[in-house]
Structure formats: C-alpha cells, structure tokens
C-alpha cells in the first residue's frame, strides 16, 4: 500500500493536473498534434493509422523507398528454381517505379532468350534502365523458348530490381534481382537521408576493386524457357555442359567446374558433351548466402488499416531475420494466368497536403491511374 500511495496526488494538485491533461487533449484535437512518436518496430495497425492516415503525413517527402531482395524471404536462387517463378503474359502493360536505396544482392540474373524463329523473347531495356549494381553472383542464361506472351512477369507479383528502378517485367541482357519495394516513414523530411548516388556514377559499381566486393559470373543454356518443363545446362565451356536437375548453391557450381577442369573431363570434339549429376552428390555445399524468415507471431494482422487499399495485409507477419543454412525446397509454381497483381497497388501518384481554414486539403502532384 505504501508503494501505491506514491502514485496518488493530493486533491488540489489532482484538479490542477487533470485540468492540464484536458487542455493537452483539446489542443491535440484542435491542431492535430501527434502525442506519440513511432520509435520501434512493434507497430500495430492502429498506430500506423494514427501516424499516416490522420493528417500526420503531410507530404510524400516523408516516404523513402527501399528495394528489398526476395533472398530475404528464403527463396531458392538457383536458375532452375528461379525461372519457375517467372512466366509470360499478354495484355498487361509493364509498370516501373523508382526506389532510393537497396540491399547488396547475393544472386542476380541476366537473360538472353530467343524464340524458335530467332526473334527476341524479352524487350530491350528502356533508356535509363541499368543493371542492378551490387551482385555477388550473376547467373547469365541464354537459350530458346516458346515465350507465350508479350512480357515476362513474376508469378508471385514481385518486382525485378534494376539500378534504382523496379519493373514488373524482365528486360533483355540487363542484370536484375528479384525483390519488392518498401517505404520508410520518416518523422520529418530530411534532405540528406538516403541520398541517391550521383547521376554520373559508373553503371557497374563492382569494377571498383577498393570496394572488396567481387562479382562472379556463371553461364547457362536453357531449352524450352517459359514452358512448364524446361532444361537448364550449366556451361563449363562452349562444348561441355552439366545438366542441373536439383537446387544447388553457386559454390557447388564453382567446385563442379574446377573438378571437371582438373580431371580433364572436357569435350575433346566439336560436339556437345553433357554431364549428369550423380544422385548421391550433395549440391548444398557451401553456404546458402541469404536470409530465412522465422515467424514469431502465428497470427496474421486481422485488423484492417486505411492502407489496406494500397497493400495486401493478408500475408503480413511479424518476422525476425537470422542467418542459417537452408535445406532444399520445392519452388512454388502456378499456371501462367496466376500472376498476382498487388504490385500494381503501390501508389505511383505523389501527393502534397496543406491546411486551409483548419482543414487538410491534399492534391496529387502527378495523376496516374493505379490498376486494381
């Protein structure tokens, strides 16, 4: 009881304190002054509503876009698994959105695919689209396929990340990583936060040896690209290949290349020599150099937010990232028509809000239709 008495106020001071509390509450209602500041990562949906949806986000200058690689979701990054996540579709225009900062990717891809008649499957990159700048391994694949559609999209609705530009489609001959775009909400706009590199910066940042970040290239040939059943060959040289039929790490392919070269198992003719992997060979050597999400909250957010029209909330979970080795997993596949369209819900129209006669008025800077 003595401890509780410390929390009690004398009657006269209680009246004065309650008066000031009511003054603060009324002042906040009148001037929309936020009483709290978001300082941690344990946000509830209602807190996001209070900060973003009730007059506290005055301008999109407070939003900073960041590209997050799908490697953070623990997806298989080998070429046979990755290509199953991509599919062709017609009648859907490509969309591009810029982002200001990103992660260093462990695995990037570069595709040069032709149709049986010799025409190109993938469109050339538009002006200003450059390859993803930070790649530890670049998987360069050439080949042929039916390519049944105008563009190659991501079946799970993710973006293809280029140099500070994210597109919904794959461009020919340009390094890209798989990822999504997230928005950071800043308490106040800061000019120096996440500044973009200079426009004149070199396109291939990995050429700078002082960065201690070397890019290694792995080459492949793909047959029947874009179809349900395709064949992927790892290229040792122009006439020697290895058939890839299971998930594997980049380190395994480098060791495989060294083994074939060391034991002189290369093709000694002008014909194509294709090796197959023994069933007992472990293709998981080395480290699966990406993250795996461990779910610490079994339930999804069930409370609806005013942001639900912009982002899907059905798959959001509280997650914690930590490093570990991943076991082999089956890559989810789906029919070409199962492309999810939540990536088209990202707001591409910038807005700015002002106060007039005590009320907030918002207007779009650039009007752009967002498809549902």
Swiss-Prot record:
An annotated GO cellular component: host cell membrane
Annotated glycan sites: 40, 204, 208, 238, 257, 268
Site location (Cleavage): 324-325
S-S bonds: 108-135, 121-147
Keywords: Cleavage on pair of basic residues, Disulfide bond, Glycoprotein, Ion channel, Ion transport, Secreted, Signal, Transport, Viral ion channel
Entries under InterPro entries matching the protein: GPC_FiloV, GPC_filovir-type_extra_dom
Region feature (Disordered): 320-340
A GO biological-process term: monoatomic ion transmembrane transport
Record's signal peptide: 1-32
Record GO terms (molecular function): channel activity
Pfam families noted in UniProt: Filo_glycop
Recorded family membership: Belongs to the filoviruses glycoprotein family.
Protein known as: Pre-small/secreted glycoprotein
Naturally occurring in which organism (per UniProt): Sudan ebolavirus (strain Boniface-76) (SEBOV)
